[in-house]
Amino acid sequence: MRSIIIASNSSGGGKTTVTLGLMKALVSRGLEVQGFKVGPDYIDTAFHESVTGKLSRNLDLFLMGEDGVKASFARGNGDYGIIEGVMGLYDGRGVTSEYSTAHLSKILKLPIVLVLTPKAQSLTLCAEIEGIVNFDSDINIVGVILNNISEGYYNLLRIAIEEHFKGKIKVFGYLPKNEALSLKSRHLGLVQSVEINTLNEKLEKCSELLENHVKVDELLKYFSKTSDFKDDYHLKNKNLKIAVAKDEAFNFYYKENLELLHELGEVTYFSPLKDKKLPENIDFLYIGGGYPEIFKDALSENKDMLLEIKNKLEDGTRCYAECGGLMYLMEAIEGSSMVGFFKGSSYMGKRLQNFGYAEVTVSKENRLLPLNIKINCHEFHKSYVNTEEETIYSVTKYTYLGENKSWRCGYTKKNVLAAYAHVHFFGNLDFLKHLVR
């Protein structure tokens, strides 16, 4: 599989638009495309899947470790792999480039195309590109695609870039301004792909514009084949019956996490929004993140499911819930009744409560996880819970000021663990083994 990384100088720089347009263009040519996303984001991978028709995979060096990232990449297959970067090219943890798109490009040894959205500049854009290219000589930036500009402005910038770089940086083309390409956002990023009724029309338009204004055949020459990486992330079948909540309200899952659960036994997906009962005779319940606050009324109205889950958990069924899953297990979300396994309620704040990479230390004796086990995680939420339930997590985030910010989380009761932390099992295999033992 030949692959390339689509990066930018900032968030909102056009990476997702170009990535989706390029994926759609290649799929329309009858090619098999594998999508990847740098970092922890769930929403972009869902957009990839809506185009390619196959699983898109996260590549997160902090959550998964270098070997985990290589294993995830090794699971990808197709004619071409397209990796969508995260934030600006060099933006990593704090004020370093650690875990950034640039860092990943060096691990996988893959070339980079920069997507830039210029405004009211000409030669200064060349200075910006030169600074990005020369900032780290160990990465390979092969060219640029300009985004959201007119044809006349593109021709001006193309000449400036070509004359300045003398062919060392290719100008592959541009995407013109077009309102049809915009994707709506909400408090945690883009609106989910499953909620956009006109998504197919948007993708078709994006692909059409990209084919007309970007030299796709020239770009494909720069896709590169990388090493064959090992994938040692497998578990023995324990014949477990596992239920996973999956619908419009709960769909933030890393694909590899689900694949590991499938290796452990039989996985059945159910909808907390629509189903009345859980799958029968389950040993383990997994409720991931999502947007339960958006669907709180519909979740609250499904009384049969709320009672079913509460009774199962009270009877001792093992359960792991992340972020939105934690909110769902509380008594209420913003006044709408929920499962009520944990005492207390969830509320929406006006700002992010905790954002970014953090490290969990299990700091209190409990029946699920060993004391002092450490877990890399990511948090991204505006909600908070008001509860006095027992916590076993001490969560620490290292700030760009060199200080440590710490807080408590990880609510436990009987055989249930619920927390705001999102965890990738590739970086925390022992964590998963303890949860399902």
From Swiss-Prot:
Stored PROSITE patterns: GATASE_COBBQ
Biological process terms from the Gene Ontology for this record are:
cobalamin biosynthetic process
UniProt keyword annotation of Magnesium present? yes
| Pathway named in the protein's UniProt entry | Cofactor biosynthesis; adenosylcobalamin biosynthesis; cob(II)yrinate a,c-diamide from sirohydrochlorin (anaerobic route): step 10/10
Q: What GO MF terms are annotated?
A: ATP binding; cobyrinic acid a,c-diamide synthase activity
Report whether Glycoprotein shows up as a keyword of the record.
no
Q: Which UniProt key words apply to this protein? A: ATP-binding, Cobalamin biosynthesis, Glutamine amidotransferase, Ligase, Magnesium, Nucleotide-binding
Q: Which cofactor does it need?
A: Mg(2+)
Assigned EC number: 6.3.5.11
Could you tell me which SUPFAM superfamilies the record lists for this protein? Class I glutamine amidotransferase-like, P-loop containing nucleoside triphosphate hydrolases
Task: Point out the annotated site residues (description: Increases nucleophilicity of active site Cys).
Answer: H422
Q: Which chemical reaction does it catalyze?
A: cob(II)yrinate + 2 L-glutamine + 2 ATP + 2 H2O = cob(II)yrinate a,c diamide + 2 L-glutamate + 2 ADP + 2 phosphate + 2 H(+)
The GATase cobBQ-type domain is annotated at: 241-430
Q: Which InterPro entries match?
A: CbiA/CobB_synth (IPR004484), Class_I_gatase-like (IPR029062), CobQ/CobB/MinD/ParA_Nub-bd_dom (IPR002586), GATase_3 (IPR011698), P-loop_NTPase (IPR027417)
UniProt-annotated catalytic positions: C323
Q: What else is known?
A: The a and c carboxylates of cobyrinate are activated for nucleophilic attack via formation of a phosphorylated intermediate by ATP. CbiA catalyzes first the amidation of the c-carboxylate, and then that of the a-carboxylate.
> What does this protein do, in the record's words?
Catalyzes the ATP-dependent amidation of the two carboxylate groups at positions a and c of cobyrinate, using either L-glutamine or ammonia as the nitrogen source.
Print the domain comment field. Comprises of two domains. The C-terminal domain contains the binding site for glutamine and catalyzes the hydrolysis of this substrate to glutamate and ammonia. The N-terminal domain is anticipated to bind ATP and cobyrinate and catalyzes the ultimate synthesis of the diamide product. The ammonia produced via the glutaminase domain is probably translocated to the adjacent domain via a molecular tunnel, where it reacts with an activated intermediate.
Write down the HAMAP family for this protein, in alphabetical order. Answer: CobB_CbiA
- Family assignment from sequence similarity: Belongs to the CobB/CbiA family.
Q: What is this protein called?
A: Cobyrinate a,c-diamide synthase
Say which species the protein is native to.
Clostridium acetobutylicum (strain ATCC 824 / DSM 792 / JCM 1419 / IAM 19013 / LMG 5710 / NBRC 13948 / NRRL B-527 / VKM B-1787 / 2291 / W)
